[in-house]
Design a protein with these regions (language model features):
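Short helix-loop-beta connector
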Residues: 122-129, 150, 203-204
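Conserved beta-strand elements of the Class I
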Residues: 129-130, 280
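N-terminal Rossmann-fold NAD(P) dinucleotide-binding loop
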Residues: 138-139
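N-terminal ligand-binding/catalytic initiation module
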Residues: 1-107, 116, 289, 299-300, ...
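Rossmann-like adenosine-cofactor binding region
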Residues: 171-253
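Glycine-rich Rossmann-fold phosphate-binding loop(s) that bind the pyrophosphate
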Residues: 133-135
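NAD(P)-binding Rossmann-fold cofactor-contacting core
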Residues: 148-169
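Adenosine-phosphate binding glycine-rich loop
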Residues: 216-314
Length: 314
């Protein structure tokens, strides 16, 4: 077998700019809605009480992808990242492996990109940004929104150093949770182990990107807050079983007809924001088609000589 290119964390981020990631993720959501891309269900394997593993496949545009990724929320106390893993991209024509990529960077970049895609489709305009949770994914949500023309912003994190560093990078301000929630576009990017948005925090015209609750039992918004919003998600089956909407669905407060998939809005097949005073909530559980969009862009960058890769022989 020929040598296989491998992109590490820094190489992935050098290969794909925030604006390219945004465009690629937007296109992937539309293509999936139109049944041009395929995505079997995500598989979870619990590793209690520490975290979980996920296997995420997708196929589109002649490529097939499998992401093997983890979520171990307690890792930072041991100096380890919460999310780690590997992405394998293969040819969907002959099955040959084409590239291996660091899953942490791919996940962070597509998570940030979908925050900007959702804001463009659902927010009232390119206004101020509140970031609640300034870890890797929160930082990339902020960077992608800034690249798309949003801001200025307020960065909040229980770790002041994280909020201060991100705010300094973007020339935004560190602030409290309440200050972040007063912004026009609010991104919640926490582990999803405690509520950070209550019904009383909602204001007319607010758009919420809920990016942290990416598995069963996780929530960043109270059921009352969720029930008060116009609801959107990345993909219904995944969001209804392991996302921000799950608790409200299980309580019988939210049903399928209340939730619109973002791809349908982007394709022009469903309405977006009901009105300027509405509060919109986008539940992002993270899709393999988004990983494929970013990985395909990175593969293209390597083939065109815009990024260097390590190589391995299998």
């Amino acid at each position: 077998m020929p040598s296989l290119p491998v992109l590490d964390h820094d190489a992935v981020l050098a290969a794909v700019s925030p604006l390219e990631a945004i465009a690629r993720v937007r296109d992937a959501l539309v293509r999936f809605h139109l049944d041009e891309w395929t995505m079997p269900a995500k598989v979870y394997m619990e590793s209690p009480p520490f975290g979980d593993f996920r296997a995420m496949p997708a196929r589109g545009d002649g490529l097939a992808l499998l992401k093997w990724v983890t979520s171990f929320p307690g890792n930072p106390v041991n100096g380890l990242p919460v999310v780690t893993g590997v992405v394998c991209v293969s040819s969907a024509i002959d099955g040959q492996p084409l590239m291996l990529l660091d899953a942490r960077s791919v996940t962070a970049l597509r998570t940030g990109a979908v925050a900007a895609v959702a804001a463009d489709a659902l927010a009232r305009g390119r206004g101020t940004v509140g970031i609640i949770g300034c870890g890797l994914h929160g930082a990339w949500a902020a960077r992608c929104l800034a690249a798309a023309g949003y801001g200025p912003g307020v960065c909040h994190d229980p770790r002041p150093d994280a909020a201060n560093a991100l705010a300094a990078e973007l020339d935004w301000d560190p602030g409290s949770r309440e200050q972040a929630l007063r912004c026009e576009v609010v991104c919640c990017v926490t582990p999803g182990l405690q509520i950070v948005v209550e019904a009383g925090d909602l204001r007319p015209g607010l758009h919420l990107n809920m990016l942290g609750a990416d598995g069963p039992g996780k929530s960043e918004a109270s059921i009352g807050a969720v029930a008060s919003c116009a609801l959107f998600c990345d993909e219904w089956e995944q969001a209804s079983h392991g996302g921000e909407l799950t608790a409200a669905i299980e309580a019988g407060i939210v049903s399928r007809d209340r939730v619109t998939e973002l791809g349908a809005v982007l394709a022009g097949d469903a309405p977006g924001r009901p009105g300027p005073e509405s509060v919109t909530l986008f539940d992002s559980t993270g899709l393999a088609i988004q990983d494929l969009a970013v990985a395909a862009a990175a593969l293209e960058a390597w083939r065109e000589g815009r990024v260097e890769a390590q190589t391995v022989r299998l």
